[in-house]
Amino acid sequence: MKYDTSELCDIYQEDVNVVEPLFSNFGGRASFGGQIITVKCFEDNGLLYDLLEQNGRGRVLVVDGGGSVRRALVDAELARLAVQNEWEGLVIYGAVRQVDDLEELDIGIQAMAAIPVGAAGEGIGESDVRVNFGGVTFFSGDHLYADNTGIILSEDPLDIE
């Protein structure tokens, strides 16, 4: 499904929170949306592998990487795992790498920057926790919509049709 965050903001102005414009689109989908699962991890993506092995249909993984752009939390291998398990998208408050490969994949990926250095894989972090970045607080179960214009968040799903 295609989402237009500008149109959604016009219709649901009182019901959405708008994430500050810190992110760029690195995935092959221009827009994506779904119910979110939150993760907090710093320069370590081991926990992301565990989560992205689950069925992601209708879901978006929101990762608070502490805003670090020193190590990439998502690479092509991890993004392919997300595609294989039907995740709608990834929002990374941090960095990604292998961007030429990422843009070929049928998944939305919003991140702050790209860097060639990969993350550790120790599995340090926590999931289903409140995370805060970009002026917005995210809770697992909220609904996120993203396109090339921006990212918005709603407690309840928005009626798109």
From Swiss-Prot:
GO cellular component: cytosol; protein-containing complex
InterPro entries membership: RraA, RraA/RraA-like, RraA/RraA-like_sf, RraA_gpbac
Keyword field contains Transport: no
Primary localization: cytoplasm
Record Gene3D superfamilies: Ribonuclease E inhibitor RraA/RraA-like (3.50.30.40)
SUPFAM superfamilies, per the entry: RraA-like
UniProt keywords, alphabetically: Cytoplasm
GO biological-process terms attached to the record: negative regulation of RNA catabolic process; protein homotrimerization
Induction notes from the record: Induced upon entry into stationary phase, in a RpoS-dependent manner. Stability of the rraA transcript is Rne dependent, suggesting the existence of a feedback mechanism in the regulation of RraA level.
Compartments (UniProt record): Cytoplasm
GO molecular function, one term: enzyme binding
Family named by the database record: Belongs to the RraA family.
Subunit structure: Homotrimer. Forms a ring-like structure with a central cavity. Binds to both RNA-binding sites in the C-terminal region of Rne and to RhlB.
General function of this protein: Globally modulates RNA abundance by binding to RNase E (Rne) and regulating its endonucleolytic activity. Can modulate Rne action in a substrate-dependent manner by altering the composition of the degradosome. Modulates RNA-binding and helicase activities of the degradosome.
NCBIfam families: NOT-MenG, PRK09372.1, RraA_entero
Comment field (misc): RraA and RraB interact with Rne at separate sites within the Rne and exert distinct effects on the composition of the degradosome, affecting distinct sets of RNA transcripts.
Protein's name according to its UniProt entry: Regulator of ribonuclease activity A
Phylogenetic classification of the source organism: Bacteria, Pseudomonadati, Pseudomonadota, Gammaproteobacteria, Enterobacterales
Record gene name: rraA
